[in-house]
Amino acid sequence: MGAGQSTTTTEGRSSPEEMSHLLAQRFASKCFTPLELTHLEDNFNSQALDEHGLRYWNEEILSRFLGIPDGAGEKASPQTDATLDAGPVLFRMVSYLGAFPFHNTLAPSVLTYDAIVKVIVLLTERYGRVLKRGRKDRMKLLFGSLADVGRTQTEKQRETSQVDTKMSSDEAYSTDGASSNITGFSIDAPANDGEEEDDDDDLALAALESLDAIEVFKHDQRLDRSVYKARISVSTFRRLLALLLVIAPLHPMGRRQMIQTDAESIDAVQPSWIASCSLGDEANGDGHYLSDFSRVITTSLPFLFDPLTPLFEHFLFSKNLDLSKRKDSHQSHEESNSPSPPPSPHLECVFLPGHFETNILNSAILSHLSFFLSTSYPIPNLFRNQTRLHPVFSSDFHGESLTAFSHHVLTWHAPSLLLLKGVTGSSSSKQETVLAGAYLPEPWKRSTSPLSTPMSDFLDTSRFPCLFQLLPTHTVLQAAPAFKSLKSNMPVVSFSTNSGIAVGCMIPPSSRTSLNNELQPRPSGGGSLIIDPALENATFYVSDGLHGDGVFLPPGLSPSSSLSLSASATSSTMSISIHSIEVWGVVPTPAELDANLDPNSPKDAISMQKAMWDFEAREAERRKTIHLNVGGGDSEAQTGRALLEMAGIIGDSQYSPRRR
């Protein structure tokens, strides 16, 4: 292993091992408080193995400490759920990251104290305190820690005699003692393929510059990839997604035991991610290469790795040093040994109480949404920023009526989340479940009212709308940078009793000839969603977006990316037979409300909605006193009252829950 290599060099300069130790010391002194280091040292030393004076952790200890499912491998049973067998994947990651920045020489590293310090700093993004020039983006580093290496079929036939000369990283670590013929992960093997070098090594370069050891780094990083093609296999990616889905709601002080996520929900979500990432067929050995991995994560799942931060911050809290346990010296031994950190939030902590129970959202879907939706600034992740969801409208409870929709949704003056679930409308092929929606940062308005958010909020991604599809494939259409400066006939969302609900569409201007027959919205830009007035059918459009401007960018593009990135090559139209529509209000966090200096912004959307409903109720009562006996007869009065009821001015029958 890398740890067993010589610590001297023929040229007399510092070896990678020495520089790695020095970097770990600098990380420890600059990136942690003394109290955090005390807890970290206690956690490590209390469970470390000792072999010839070398203290380290193995995969079993790491999985047990973090509460990671680790039921496959040698201990697998017929009842084992291999989907949640994330222990080997996580151990491979930390073994690679522990060798930072000398992955070619030292990886896979033994999980010593120095290695764990570097892993925590990298996965919690604390390195900015030391590496001022280092990139915030860890994409290449994370890819390297997850990548498997495969050969083409031609290479396998030509080099069958040399297949066993390279040990896998897991086999290398499982052998006793150090091995002198291991040079690191195969992802870093030299090969001279003539490809254009990827100079996305700012993080590693910054680390070595801080130690004045660039020459050591250059000696270690002679990379080439013609023989070995680095990729993340379908199996590895599948287990990674399952792990991230489960730990998404985890808080740093939460219990490390895995949240009981519905396995069926995970199985339903994962295939859409696999399809969107173009991982290919697992049986044929296809995998996910760096370019695709970087594109998909950047544009479609920008917060995918956020759950790793609170997971590894558990190292900074030791229950053995919990001072709260010493307040009562008379506590029983059982009570003193009980874990003190509070549990991580479940769905009931995210959802506010309301009139209906969701038929769309579950733990896996909510975790899925947290990987790309930005609901606050500067902390975008909805689990980290304490965002709460308030039930606003449900077609299952309030009825499939635009009148009921407008009564509940148009009175909500805060960001909202529109979700619809149904099946594909094509009868010629097998129907598939469809789950689509949109994040709308502005309150709903009738027709085409202009947006009120100023253009100065460009860095605040929570002010940008987002159109997405979660099933049967994962597709995210982010807002165009100039969506707020589009013409008034191209609003983010349009609501009309004649044309229905339109998201990201161009609304034709009204004219005398169309007063009684309003023109239908037209798709524009990279994608649009149109729901008919009956709330029974919808159409989801995705296009290359190059034919005209629009609210949303094509798939594969983000507001900060250049147009040279690969976007969707073809246009597609999906007809959806709607089963359920839900609208959830996004309640701002307390910190966001305190920092909000806009006097016109709603301080409490729930109270404002209730006040508007109370006003409508008073107006309805007042209209009941209108003298309807215009013709002097009871029949005319009954006719007038019936007209008012049909118009929705009096009476509440149109808002009553639909009976099923």
From Swiss-Prot:
Region: Disordered, residue numbers: 153-199
Gene Ontology CC terms, in alphabetical order: cytoplasm
Pfam families (alphabetical): TLD
Keyword field: Cytoplasm
Recorded superkingdom: Eukaryota
InterPro entries in the record: TLDc_dom
Protein family according to the UniProt entry: Belongs to the RTC5 family.
Protein name, as recorded: Restriction of telomere capping protein 5
Organism: Uncinocarpus reesii (strain UAMH 1704)
